[in-house]
């Protein structure tokens, strides 16, 4: 028996050693190893909330079949109604930076709509008759210049029999004269029709807002149009003018927060210069020059470069290799730092022709890639991303609602377990009825029993680490985040939670 006992003990020793070695490879091993006593206590509290919340959610509604990986829009309402404890903590959690979000889908739709109502230049049109017996059509919005405002001043109301589909009418006039429910019925229609692209006409009136727990943002902005629309509806706003307005808006937010004693909560925001991937190579050259000129004049505002549009449509990165290699060398010659942050690896199928974009993105030295869904099917490319520190902008909710993958098949846990840098991003949150990152962090928390509060801590820190902040800005961001994290942990341990602010649409 002595020999058997010795062998058993040796097996158990090796087993413990193997588990410890594997745990040391976890992406959050540093956060776990260096956890303070307060953090350890907070982890226990949050884990208890998760377990209790899970039981409540599975028994939440007799009319809804609850299951792992269920669709977000259904689960979202149940989370907000039932799992208020864990959800409340996710709202308060300091999330660091928001590194993937499109400007026209970052703000609350209701906020943008109310803002649009204040401007007489904003007009609306529909492409079919508006009748009480048919589904209401999708509206289109656009700010018109003074001459066109006069031209369309006599347009009949949308609900009138003599309205000609496709004709512009003042948004204010259309709302005030809406026959099917009055202004309230009009509001319900407009807000209910808000989807990807539905707010295109009001996108340039969107105000930058600070989501809970987010101290910094890199916002993808469409620079494809050489002139944009001013407040009076005229298309005379240059890219340079736009950056001046953006800079003023950021400074206004900082000044207001400083006056409230909250200046350490918001580091700032930058723009990722984006253009359509349908442009030819010659046309792209103009935009690459423009991007460099703007970076030279506004070094603290331009963060990186990317293409817009679904990866399957338009040109692959291979088509743009010549201008992109030139751009990379030219930025170096001019002393400019404009990293590539490409949308690649979007389709889950490795047989999709756009899947090859992963190869070009890594060879071009991309700083980040997103959605990166297919990266997990390329072991060599995963290893390259890990070794080179190329972060994946993971958008679990957006990937589901865009039909790219189901929640239960999302490769987030695979990427984390393999050690590939990951940052959580919302992508198009306002299109899905929420804002900020709270739901994205909630999903990361509940997607695996091995995830805990310290896992989220590491993900938040990575959003600063893999941002386009310069060294000084990154230092300030880390310091501000650490301060907020300490307060956050104390709040959990002491039980001092503020009541959740849930209205069914906003976080």
Regions found by a protein language model. Name each.
Residues 2-507:
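Metal-cofactor-binding active-site regions of metalloenzymes
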